[in-house]
Structures are given as C-alpha cells and as structure tokens.
C-alpha cells in the first residue's frame, strides 16, 4: 500500500456573504477532492488539541501522527531544523518575520511577500548590526527567518504572531513577560537599521511594502521526536516550500524533498510538487505534500486568491496524484484535508475541526458524499477524529 497525505493549508473557512453564504470549499471548483469524498469516506479532524495554539506547527504535527501534547516545543525549532541550524540544549529559537509597520501598526506580516534574495541581504545586515554572542540571525525563505538566543534567553517571553494582529497597534502586542522588554527593544532597534536600507528604499520606489521591522514569535527549544518509521513501520517523505513542514520531516527522520520553484505562495511550482510526490512513492511508503497558498490568501483576506489557491491545489496537486493512484499497479490510500481553517473574515487561524476525506483504490465502499467541504464532512461516517490518530488508522486499516 502507498499513502499520499495532501494538505491544503488553511483551506477550511466560514460561510461568506459575497459567496452566497458558501464557504471557499463549497464555492470552489474541486472535482478531484469531490471525487475522493464521493468514492471514499469523510469526517472531521480535530487538528488543534485543547490548550495549544492554532498554528500550522501544531496542526501539521498532528496530521503527521505526532501528538503535539507530547512532542510540541514551539514553532521556530522546527524551522531551525529545516534550515540546518543545530540547537544547543540552552538555545531558544524564534521565528523572525520581516514585516511592514506603518503609523505604529502592522500593515503587512509578510513585507509584501518579500523575495528571499532581498530578505537575505536584510537579515545579514541585521546580524552584523544587532547580532552578538547571545543573538544570531539566520536567513530563511521570503519573510520567514530565524533568531537564535543563547542561555535560554526568551524561553518564557510572551510573543504574539504578527498575522494575528494585522492593522493593530504594535505597542499593545510587543513581547511581554520575562525578558519581554529586551525583545521589544530589539524590534525597535531593527526599525532603525532597516528604515533607510537600500533594499527598502528600492522597494518603496517600486510601490512595494518595505521590510522595515522584524517581529519575533513562536520560540522554543529543540524537541525530541520518535522516528516516523519506528512509530508506524513505514518510510516517508515530506514535500513543502515551508521550513516549518520541512523541520517536522527532519525531526521525524523522513526524507525532505526539495522542489525547485516551490515558493509557499500562489506562484508555487504545483506541477513540480505533484511529480516529486509520484516519484518518491516509487521508493517510499508515504508522502506528505503540503501547499501553503490557501493559508496565505486567507491571511490576506482575499476571496479571489483563496478560491484560486484551492482550485489550483485541487487541479494541480490532488488531480494528478489521484490519476496516478487509480492507474497504479499498487493499492493507494489518499488522505486530503486542510491543517486548520484560515477564515477570510478573521484573516488568521481558527481552531475548528477540519473536513478530511480518505480514498482507497482497493475499496468500493464509500459515503457517496456530494462534495468535499465542511458541511458534507459533518455527515460523514468517520465522525470526529483526533488528527494525530489519522496516520495510525490509515496504516493499520485492512
């Protein structure tokens, strides 16, 4: 049996008036996911355990079969693993966003989805100006970077994700708690370094949002994972543009497949991801394919972009993998779901359970669902499932 786990990050949503009261999944044209729902079984998955933040780190860890209540130590350590940054036992890793601040408010948590090339220059400048024996900056992808603090500095600091406070005054959300003042001052110092940087002056001339500040959040120390193969007796691989997902794969001992042109946005290389998934399943039992675009569109509050992202995920990821599964000599199981909702109305993550559908090429019994969406999933035979149990259920099913 081969397994494909296909994640459309943030696809789930709430009913939208401009769509006639439909959710994004209900309004989008998604024939491949609808086929899986009609010819497989559907239900709702609780991806965010009680008491943990509604983040892609927690949700995707759950979907990959790792209970966050046991394994979760923060978002940034996972991203550090993907970037090849080794953490000492007393290191604290922070996600370090490049953001746009205007009139004392966060205008854009992504600094206009700044290019990785521009961002690298800015992060290297910050490391030269603000880095020292206890602080180091590491460049990542687009607006997503890393700050490493020594001697457990910031381990108990209270931080807020920037995508949760778009349009809000930063003074109300600067780091707080133990050592909060230190990291608040660091953010303010970054503004001085970045404001007149040539990269930002050029971006302003081009009508783009400048990356005129950092924002730190999501900190934690290195987690300890049981290898995926030891847990489930299956070999696996991860395909994603996002360091967070790659880092989960690294800690799980899975292959992390790099796909050229995978950006984590609407312009990602969908075909490259689908082809890589099909190829890796020649030698591995399971592939986990993650697409970030629907989540980014949700954070932007763009109905049109989110519809396009979901339809592209369906036609350019799900459809080719489904076609391959149906024509393969080996039996296939496909699991498709979002990791969490990123509703247009709130522009951030929600904790609600998400729809999921499972299709097996060697089974004919199904729920005969009319479509893959939130409402259909409520009527599914699989009911409400703890997401961290899903992989175990799939690989043990007869």
Swiss-Prot record:
Biological processes, Gene Ontology terms: glycolytic process
Gene3D superfamilies attached to this UniProt entry: Alkaline Phosphatase, subunit A, Metalloenzyme domain
Coiled coil start-end: none
Reaction(s) catalysed by this chain's protein: (2R)-2-phosphoglycerate = (2R)-3-phosphoglycerate
Single GO term (MF): metal ion binding
Pfam families with a match to the protein in the record: Metalloenzyme (PF01676), PhosphMutase (PF10143)
Alphabetized SUPFAM superfamilies for the sequence: Alkaline phosphatase-like (SSF53649)
Enzymatic class: isomerase
Pathway connected to this protein: Carbohydrate degradation; glycolysis; pyruvate from D-glyceraldehyde 3-phosphate: step 3/5
Keywords of the record: Glycolysis, Isomerase
Superkingdom field: Archaea
Catalytic activity, EC: 5.4.2.12
Family label: Belongs to the BPG-independent phosphoglycerate mutase family. A-PGAM subfamily.
Annotated function: Catalyzes the interconversion of 2-phosphoglycerate and 3-phosphoglycerate.
Protein name (database record): 2,3-bisphosphoglycerate-independent phosphoglycerate mutase
This protein's encoding gene: apgM
């Amino acid at each position: 049996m081969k397994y494909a786990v296909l994640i459309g990050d943030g696809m789930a949503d709430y009913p939208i008036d401009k769509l006639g009261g439909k959710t994004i999944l209900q309004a989008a044209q998604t024939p491949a996911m609808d086929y899986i729902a009609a010819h497989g079984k559907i239900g709702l998955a609780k991806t965010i355990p009680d008491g943990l933040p509604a983040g892609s780190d927690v949700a995707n860890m759950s979907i990959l079969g790792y209970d966050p209540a046991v394994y979760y130590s923060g978002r940034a350590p996972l991203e550090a693993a993907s970037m090849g940054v080794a953490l000492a036992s007393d290191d604290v890793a922070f996600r370090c966003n490049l953001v746009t601040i205007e009139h004392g408010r966060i205008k854009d948590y992504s600094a206009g989805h700044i290019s990785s090339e521009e961002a690298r220059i800015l992060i290297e400048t910050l490391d030269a100006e603000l880095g020292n024996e206890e602080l180091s900056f590491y460049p990542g992808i687009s607006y997503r970077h890393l700050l490493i603090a020594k001697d457990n500095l910031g381990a108990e600091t209270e931080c807020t994700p920037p995508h949760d406070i778009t349009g809000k005054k930063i003074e109300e959300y600067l780091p707080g708690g133990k050592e909060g003042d230190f990291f608040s001052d660091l953010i303010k110092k970054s503004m001085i370094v970045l404001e007149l940087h040539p990269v930002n002056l050029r971006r302003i001339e081009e009508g783009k949002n400048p990356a005129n500040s950092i924002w730190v959040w999501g900190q934690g120390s290195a987690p300890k994972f049981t290898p995926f193969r030891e847990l489930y007796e299956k070999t696996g691989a991860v395909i994603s543009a996002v360091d967070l997902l790659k880092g989960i794969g690294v800690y799980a001992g899975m292959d992390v497949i790099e796909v050229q042109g995978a950006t984590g946005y609407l312009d990602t290389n969908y075909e490259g991801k689908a082809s890589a998934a099909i190829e890796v399943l020649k030698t591995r039992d399971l592939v986990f394919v993650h697409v970030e675009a629907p989540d980014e569109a949700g954070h932007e509050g763009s109905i049109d972009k989110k519809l396009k992202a979901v339809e592209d995920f369906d036609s350019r990821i799900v459809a080719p993998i489904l076609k391959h599964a149906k024509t393969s000599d080996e039996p296939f199981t496909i699991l498709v779901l979002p990791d969490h909702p990123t509703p247009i109305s709130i522009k951030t993550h929600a904790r609600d359970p998400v729809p999921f559908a499972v299709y097996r090429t060697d089974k004919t019994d199904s729920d005969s669902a009319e479509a893959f969406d939130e409402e259909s999933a409520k009527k599914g035979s699989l009911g409400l499932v703890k997401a961290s149990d899903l992989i175990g259920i799939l690989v043990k099913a007869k």
